[in-house]
C-alpha cells in the first residue's frame, strides 16, 4: 500500500489552516432537583434575575431565586422530560415577547408563541415583559373618554384613556361581558373614525377554561373585532409560571401602541388567578408566606403591572394604555387581601353584584359602591350635561326605596322620586353585545332625566328606548351628528331633541 506522506501532510496543513472555532461557548449548570414546575440548578453563577434559561429539548425557564449555592428556576412548560443532572444553558436574555401590529388578530401564549394555528408571527420588534413604568414627568392627567358603550358605566363611572378601572365581583356576575362589550364598542371607531381615536385591544385570559377563551375569540371574530385585538391566553391547564407571566406579556404588547402615540386597552381576566399562580410559585421556591399565604411582594406584583397603564404627555407622543383589571371576589367580600390591594392601586372600581344580576339588572353595577377617581374629566361635555343629575337621583331613589318598604302613605314628591328612580334604573339596563355610541347614550339619558319616561310603565321603558333610537337613526340623524361633532348640547340641539322626543312620544303607545 503506497502512503504518500507529502499528500497527507498537505491535507492536514490545509485542515489546520481552515479550522473554524465552531465550539459554542455558553455558561451551563446542572439540575440538582426538579418537581412541581420548579428546578434547582447548580452552577449558573452569573445568571441575572428574570433571565431566560434553556433545558434540554428546548424547554425554557426563568431564573427567579438567586441563592448562594443554587438558582431557583421556574419552568415554562412540562417538567416531565427534565431530570436530575441535566444541563441548563444561560441565554443571556431577560424574558421578552414579540410586539407590534403583526400580533393583531392573533391568539398567543404568555411567551408570544401563536396558538391559533394561523402560522408564525413575523414581528419586527421584541420587548421585555417586565419594564419600569413611566415616571411622573412623561405622564399627563387623564382627559379623553374611553367609551365602553354601556350606559351605566359611561354615564356614572366614566373611564378615561390611560386610567386603570377595576372590574370586581363574584363569579358569574358579568365581569368578562363588560370587557367584551368594551372591545366590541371600538369597532365603529376602527371602521370609520380618525386614526388618532382608534383603540387597539389586548385581552389577557389567566387561568380560564380553554372553552371559555375559544368562545371569547369566536364572538370577536364573528363581530369583526378580532382584527384590532390581541388575545394572550394562559389557560387553567398551563403551568403556573405561564399564568404569572401572561399579564406582563400582554402589557408589553399594549405598551408598544402607547409608546408609539397610539391608544390601547388591556383587560386582565383575572388578576386573582395570577396572584394564586404567583403564590404557588413562591411557596415552591420556599419564599416566606404572608397573609392568606401570599408572598410579601404580591402587592408589588400587581402595582408594577398596573402602573404601566398611563396617559403620556404630548412630548412623549400623547399615547395611552388603559387597563381594566378583573378581580373575582368570594361571597361579595371586597375586604379580602387581593381585592383591597388592587382597589388601592387602581383609579376606581366597577362593583358588580350577584343580587342585582339575578334581579335582571344587567350590567349588574352597584352604582353606590362603584367609583371613578377620574370622574367627569373622562366625559364629553354633552354627557356631563345629561348625566350630572342622574347619580344623585339614583342615590336618593335607593335611600327612599329602602324606607318606602315600611310606609304606604308617601307624599307626592317622594312618590315622584320613586317613579323616576325606577325608570332610570330600567333605562340603565342593557343587553349584552349591544354597545351604544356616546351620542345615542346622551339622547336616551336626556329623555330619562327630562321626565319623558315618567308617564310610561316601567316594563315599557326598554321598548321606548329602542323605538326612540331607531326613530333618531332614521329621522333625527342630524341631531346625533351634531352631538357627536360638537360634543356638547347647545340650546338649539336641546330644542331639537325635545321636539324629536315630543314627536316620538305621541306615536308611542
UniProtKB/Swiss-Prot annotation:
It catalyses: ATP + H2O + 4 H(+)(in) = ADP + phosphate + 5 H(+)(out). Transmembrane segments: none annotated. Its EC number is 7.1.2.2. Keywords: ATP synthesis, ATP-binding, Cell inner membrane, Cell membrane, CF(1), Hydrogen ion transport, Ion transport, Membrane, Nucleotide-binding, Translocase, Transport. The record marks 370 as: Required for activity. The keyword Ion transport applies. It is found in: Cell inner membrane. PROSITE patterns: ATPASE_ALPHA_BETA. It is an enzyme of class 7 (translocase). It holds the Pfam family ATP-synt_ab_N. It is a peripheral membrane protein. The keyword Translocase applies. Produces ATP from ADP in the presence of a proton gradient across the membrane. The alpha chain is a regulatory subunit. F-type ATPases have 2 components, CF(1) - the catalytic core - and CF(0) - the membrane proton channel. CF(1) has five subunits: alpha(3), beta(3), gamma(1), delta(1), epsilon(1). CF(0) has three main subunits: a(1), b(2) and c(9-12). The alpha and beta chains form an alternating ring which encloses part of the gamma chain. CF(1) is attached to CF(0) by a central stalk formed by the gamma and epsilon chains, while a peripheral stalk is formed by the delta and b chains. This is ATP synthase subunit alpha. The gene is atpA.
